[in-house]
């Protein structure tokens, strides 16, 4: 069920060229966020690959001293780049709205879950930056505690987005138009990501093995699946924008706001 909207008067229609340019920029912002966040986390701050959960407090402090500058600069850079994720989320939701022909349940869930998404990057880095800021003055045990909180909130937080993936996949399957907004295989990519993210909920119980925060099921498979999703989704959004523009031109449809 969705809220049906009547076409607005011509004077309230949005300039279509502006809308499509904005959506294309928003789709590309998904690539930018992934590239910058991945580069910062893997190469600058070196929080990925994750530390061994069984590292001693002294080992954690030594690691943090060695990577202090990278951790703090990662937070600075991400503060400028991660907000672009909202553009990506909004455009994804807009295209889902085409499927439901209004602000339906699936679209609204996508919007709300998408609002939470940047917090999954920001909040953990704030915690780690607070630890690294005065790293020389902190006891190893405090630094170990804050590192635990970082990985719990970063790796474990990903499980929350299972619902977002399910909603996007479901919307893709219910699209019965001749030329669907998203191809059918994209639904299964989303369902796969939802399944792969689920083991992240178990990291609080394990310090080693595939379900630890550096394990195969809790980190590496979700990381790979997320990369596939984050590459395919912007590409499909660009195609969806093209189809929307063509559809509007053929039918001379106003853009609903």
Q: Predicted segment positions?
A:
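Hydrophobic, aromatic-enriched alpha-helical segments typical of multi-pass transmembrane helices
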Residues: 2-257
């Amino acid at each position: 069920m969705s809220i049906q909207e009547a076409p607005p008067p011509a004077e309230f229609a949005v300039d279509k060229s502006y809308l499509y340019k904005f959506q294309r920029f928003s789709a590309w912002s998904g690539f930018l966020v992934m590239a910058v966040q991945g580069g910062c986390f893997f190469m600058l701050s070196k929080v990925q690959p994750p530390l061994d959960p069984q590292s001693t407090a002294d080992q954690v402090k030594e690691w943090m001293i060695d990577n202090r500058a990278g951790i703090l600069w990662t937070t600075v850079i991400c503060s400028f780049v991660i907000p672009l994720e909202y553009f990506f989320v909004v455009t994804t939701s807009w295209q889902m709205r085409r499927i439901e022909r209004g602000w339906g349940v699936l679209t609204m869930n996508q919007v709300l879950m998408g609002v939470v998404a940047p917090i999954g990057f920001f909040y953990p880095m704030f915690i780690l930056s607070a630890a690294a800021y005065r790293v020389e003055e902190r006891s190893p045990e405090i630094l170990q505690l804050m590192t635990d909180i970082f990985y719990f909130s970063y790796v474990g937080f990903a499980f929350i987005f299972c619902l977002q993936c399910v909603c996007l996949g479901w919307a893709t399957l219910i699209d019965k138009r001749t030329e669907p907004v998203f191809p059918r295989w994209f639904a299964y990519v989303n369902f796969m990501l939802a399944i792969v993210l689920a083991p992240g909920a178990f990291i609080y119980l394990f310090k080693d093995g595939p379900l630890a925060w550096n394990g195969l099921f809790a980190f590496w498979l979700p990381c790979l699946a997320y990369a596939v999703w984050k590459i395919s989704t912007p590409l499909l959004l660009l195609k969806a924008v093209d189809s929307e523009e063509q559809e509007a031109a053929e039918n001379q449809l106003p853009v609903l706001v």
